[in-house]
Amino acid sequence: MENLSERFNALQDLLMNIYEAAEQTLEAQIKHWQTLRQEAVLLYFARQRGVTRLGYQPVPVKAVSEAKAKEAIAMVLQLQSLQTSEYASETWTLVDTSIETFRSAPDGHFKKGPVPVEVIYDNDADNANLYTMWTYVYYMEDDVWHKARSGVNETGIYYLQGTFKYYYVLFADDARKYSQTGQWEVKVNKETVFAPVTSSTPPGSPGGQADTNASSKTSTTTTATVDSTTKQLTTSEQPQQTETKGRKYGRRPSSRTRRPQAKQRRSRSRHRSSRSRSRSQSRSHTPTTRSATTRSRSPSLAKTGVQRVSTRSRSRSTSRRGGRRRRSRSPSTSSSTTTTNKRSRVRAETTGSRGARGGRGARGGSGGGRRRGRSSSSTSPAHKRSREHSVRSRGVSPDQVGKSLRSVSSKHTGRLGRLLEEALDPPVILVRGEANTLKCFRNRAKIKYMGLYRSFSTTWSWVAGDGTERLGRPRMLISFSSYNQRRDFDDVVRYPKGVEKSYGNLDSL
């Protein structure tokens, strides 16, 4: 107990000397973090032995001491790596190397020169957020330290990685929470650097252009309203063109909404009804002759299905569905009841013969005949199931492996069928995190998990479609030979902290 107290007091004195000296060298910062590590280890050991107080200092629980010791070890490793770079001779203060500065955005980088950035939402001075822009950002790439400058624009705060802009603050994210109009104003050192911009069409995005004049900065909603008003004025200036189109593109106030298929049926029935009226008017002078002709022609129509009768029946049934039964009928049909009965008998016989044949003539019949014609030409579900069963029984050919782009369903498939369907999609895992973390994970996996994967990709990032800045965190792909291999890999491998993963499939590798 006394030895622990003496050792703890010695570490406290050493820390006080470091704080009083306030040296701005990298060696002094490494010594500071090594002392903090020793203090955390001592407190962990004391708590493990049941000691709850060292002098006037209460001993925290083991989890707290363990977390602080790990933080100190990580900072010592980072500072020792930075000591081997060309930036070791620069001035480094306790603030520059503190854990709070290291973990602030952008996380996992050393930073210097904080600059306050104020963002005002909706032109309301009380509705504002403060951000920190770092003048210099030190990051590691391919085990080499780089120094980059930060900048700010209407989109957010970024630092340059070569020619790419890496945004570590995006104003649009907070605008969704704090802004009602989606507009904000950016101020640096209380000076306005960007006038109010909108989140709907930010300058530089594919949907808008960055204008320098404040008068031309209008929202997308206003532009869309002006365009729609212009279209309405143009339409009202051309009433004849609207009346010519008729009910094809518009609808009467009293009519109900119809689907596009119903519009196509009406246009076809209007054309066929006009032909039917022209024929019926030419035959309206001799109803007795037409009745006799129908009587003598009906047996042959039931056997051969002449296209004339099918055309007349198609026009009547289509016009009856469209709600214009009186227009499609000829004026002479009401003159003879006997003729109407004969025509209905001929229509019934023709429909029966047409349904028995199942040919193209069935498409022009009544609604039921049309549905029967379509269902006969399509593949039944039983045929689909039998075809899929035959594919599963035959297996997957080598040229078909990796061709499917759909995810495999877990329903109605046995184990063999699922394995065969999974062979069509080479599985992958997409991991997201810091570039250095992903590279270390890849190097460690090559040693510890050899045989549990197929290959690793290099780290990569998405690039904006209208610029060269990188979007989001770096990514890396891990490919596998089978789904079982990916499952085994996922069960065994322990991913680093802060790394996210998602599953996917590729057409080919």
Swiss-Prot record:
Region (Disordered): 197-413
Polar residues composition bias: residue spans: 232-243
Main subcellular localisation: host cell
Biased composition (Gly residues): 355-368
Keyword Transcription (UniProt): yes
Listed Pfam families: PPV_E2_C (PF00511), PPV_E2_N (PF00508)
Keywords: Activator, DNA replication, DNA-binding, Early protein, Host nucleus, Phosphoprotein, Repressor, Transcription, Transcription regulation
A Gene Ontology term for the protein's cellular component: host cell nucleus
Composition-biased stretches (Basic residues): 247-282, 311-329
Region (DNA-binding domain): 425-509
Region of interest called Transactivation domain, as start-end residue ranges on this chain: 1-200
GO molecular function ontology, one term from the record: DNA-binding transcription factor activity
One GO process term, biological-process aspect: DNA-templated transcription
Ranges of biased composition (kind: Low complexity): 211-231, 283-310, 330-341
PTM note: Phosphorylated.
Localization per record: Host nucleus
Quaternary structure note: Binds DNA as homodimer. Interacts with protein E1; this interaction greatly increases E1 DNA-binding activity. Interacts with protein L1; this interaction enhances E2-dependent replication and transcription activation. Interacts with protein L2; this interaction inhibits E2 transcriptional activity but not DNA replication function E2. Interacts with protein E7; this interaction inhibits E7 oncogenic activity. Interacts with host TAF1; this interaction modulates E2-dependent transcriptional regulation. Interacts with host BRD4; this interaction mediates E2 transcriptional activation function.
Similarity section: Belongs to the papillomaviridae E2 protein family.
Protein's job: Plays a role in the initiation of viral DNA replication. A dimer of E2 interacts with a dimer of E1 in order to improve specificity of E1 DNA binding activity. Once the complex recognizes and binds DNA at specific sites, the E2 dimer is removed from DNA. E2 also regulates viral transcription through binding to the E2RE response element (5'-ACCNNNNNNGGT-3') present in multiple copies in the regulatory regions of the viral genome. Activates or represses transcription depending on E2RE's position with regards to proximal promoter elements including the TATA-box.
Protein name: Regulatory protein E2
Originating species: Human papillomavirus 36
